[in-house]
C-alpha cells in the first residue's frame, strides 16, 4: 500500500514538474526549437514561409525573403536565429499598403487593428476602413507609390505590411517593423488567398485562417467538379489598355491565367512560363485578342468614362474588329474587385458563369460588370 502511494506521488510530481517547465518557458532568452505541434501546412503559396517554434515564437519569411522573428509580448526573443527584425505578437496597430490586406484581416476579426492605409477614403468600399478614416482613427499615409514616412513614424505601428518597393533603409532608420507582402506574385488564386495564414501568424489567429481557407478550397473544388467534362472552353482575352495605348497582359505563369482555366476558359495569351505582366503594343494585343470570345478588362472602366462598348471603341478604334466587341461580350471589374481577395472562390464562380452562362441560370454577377453596347 505504501509502495503504491509512493508511485502515485512520484507520478504526480513528474506531471507537476512537466507542467511548470512547459508553461513557464525560458526565464531568459533561450534557444527556441522547432515545434511541429503548431505547424500549419502551406499548400499553395510559395512566397512566404512560417516556422513554428517553442514558447509561442514563430520565424516568418516574408515576400522578399526577410526573416521576422515573432515573439509573444513581454517575452525575451530566443537566441540562435538569424533574423532581420523581431516583432512582438499579437500585433495591435498595423498599416496596410495594399487593398488586398484589409479584407483578409476582416476575416480574421482584426480589421480594427488597422491605423493607416495608402488609399484615399473615397476609393474604399470596406465600411470599417471608410468609417475609420472618416473618424480619424485610420490615417491616409500618401499614395500607394510613395508612402509618407513621417506620418508613418508618427503612427508608430507594430508592423507595416509593406510593398516590395518600399524604401527599406528609411524604414529601418525610423525603426518601423515591416513585413513585405507579395501575394500578387503567386501563381495560383488559392495561393494568393492562402496569404491569410501569413497575416494570421501576427495575430495568433491560425485556426481562424485555416478554417476559412479550407472552406474556400472546398468551394473551388465543388465548382471544378461542376465544370468537369467541358467540351468547349471559350477563348478569353484579359488585358488593360493604358492612356499611352500600351497594354498589360498577365503572363502564362500567373494566378490570372490559372483562374481563367479553373473557371473553364482558355487564355489566349501565350509565351514563356513567366510571372507578372507583359507590356505589349496595341497591335500585338490585336493579334492575340481579335478572335477571343470574351474580353475582360482588369479595370473599372466606368470610372474612366468608358460606360459602353461604343465609347471603348471610340477611344481605341483598333478594337472594332474584335470578335468579343462585335458580340457584345466585354466585361470589366466592379470598383470593389481589388478589395475582395477574401471572395476568391466567388470570383472564380463569377468567371465560370461568364464563360458558361448555361450552367449558371439566374447567376448574379458580383465582381464583374458587363459593358452595354451603347
Predicted features along the sequence, with ranges:
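N-terminal hydrophobic or amphipathic helices and topogenic motifs
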Residues: 2, 10, 25-90, 360-374
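Bacterial N-terminal signal peptides
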Residues: 13-22
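A short, structured surface patch at a secondary-structure boundary
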Residues: 58-155, 159-165
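Basic- and aromatic-lined ligand-binding clefts that recognize polyanionic substrates
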Residues: 93-108, 208-263
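Extracytoplasmic ligand-binding site segments that recognize negatively charged/polar headgroups
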Residues: 101, 117-128, 168, 181-198, ...
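Short helices/loops that flank or line small-molecule/ion binding pockets
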Residues: 146-156, 280-291
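Structured C-terminal subdomain patch of bacterial secreted/periplasmic proteins
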Residues: 186-215, 224, 297-374
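His/Asp/Glu-enriched short active-site or ligand-binding loop at hydrolase and phosphoryl-transfer sites
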Residues: 253-277, 296-300
Amino acid at each position: 500500500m505504501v509502495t503504491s502511494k509512493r508511485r502515485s506521488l512520484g507520478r504526480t510530481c513528474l506531471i507537476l514538474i512537466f507542467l511548470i517547465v512547459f508553461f513557464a518557458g525560458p526565464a531568459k532568452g533561450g534557444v527556441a526549437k522547432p515545434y511541429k505541434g503548431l505547424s500549419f501546412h502551406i499548400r499553395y503559396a510559395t512566397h512566404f514561409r512560417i516556422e513554428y517554434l517553442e514558447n509561442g515564437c514563430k520565424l516568418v519569411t516574408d515576400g522578399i525573403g526577410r526573416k521576422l522573428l515573432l515573439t509573444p509580448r513581454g517575452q525575451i526573443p530566443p537566441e540562435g536565429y538569424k533574423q532581420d527584425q523581431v516583432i512582438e505578437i499579437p500585433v495591435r496597430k498595423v498599416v496596410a499598403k495594399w487593398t488586398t490586406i484589409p479584407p483578409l484581416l476582416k476575416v480574421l476579426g482584426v480589421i480594427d487593428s488597422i491605423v493607416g492605409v495608402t488609399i484615399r477614403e473615397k476609393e474604399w468600399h470596406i465600411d470599417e476602413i471608410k468609417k475609420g478614416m472618416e473618424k480619424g482613427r485610420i490615417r491616409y499615409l500618401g499614395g500607394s507609390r510613395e508612402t509618407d514616412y513621417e506620418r508613418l513614424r508618427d503612427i508608430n505601428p507594430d508592423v507595416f505590411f509593406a510593398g516590395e518597393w518600399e524604401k527599406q533603409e528609411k524604414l529601418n532608420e525610423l525603426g518601423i517593423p515591416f513585413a513585405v507582402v507579395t501575394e500578387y506574385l503567386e501563381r495560383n488564386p488559392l495561393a494568393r488567398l492562402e496569404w491569410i495564414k501569413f497575416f494570421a501568424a501576427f495575430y495568433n489567429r491560425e485556426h481562424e485562417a485555416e478554417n476559412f481557407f479550407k472552406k474556400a478550397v472546398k468551394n473551388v473544388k465543388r465548382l471544378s467538379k461542376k465544370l468537369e467534362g467541358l467540351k468547349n472552353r471559350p477563348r478569353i482575352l484579359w488585358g488593360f489598355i493604358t492612356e499611352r495605348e500600351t497594354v498589360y497582359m498577365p503572363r502564362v505563369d500567373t494566378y490570372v491565367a490559372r483562374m481563367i482555366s479553373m473557371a473553364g476558359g482558355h487564355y489566349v495569351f501565350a509565351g514563356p512560363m513567366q510571372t507578372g505582366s507583359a507590356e505589349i503594343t496595341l497591335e500585338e494585343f490585336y493579334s492575340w485578342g481579335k478572335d477571343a470570345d470574351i474580353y475582360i478588362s482588369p479595370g473599372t472602366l466606368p470610372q474612366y468614362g468608358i460606360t459602353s462598348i461604343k465609347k471603348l471603341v471610340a477611344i481605341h478604334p483598333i478594337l472594332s474588329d474584335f470578335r468579343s466587341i462585335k458580340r457584345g461580350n466585354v466585361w470589366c471589374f466592379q470598383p470593389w474587385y481589388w478589395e475582395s481577395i477574401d471572395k476568391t472562390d466567388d470570383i472564380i464562380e463569377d468567371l465560370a458563369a461568364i464563360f458558361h452562362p448555361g450552367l449558371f441560370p439566374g447567376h448574379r454577377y458580383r465582381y464583374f460588370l458587363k459593358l452595354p453596347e451603347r
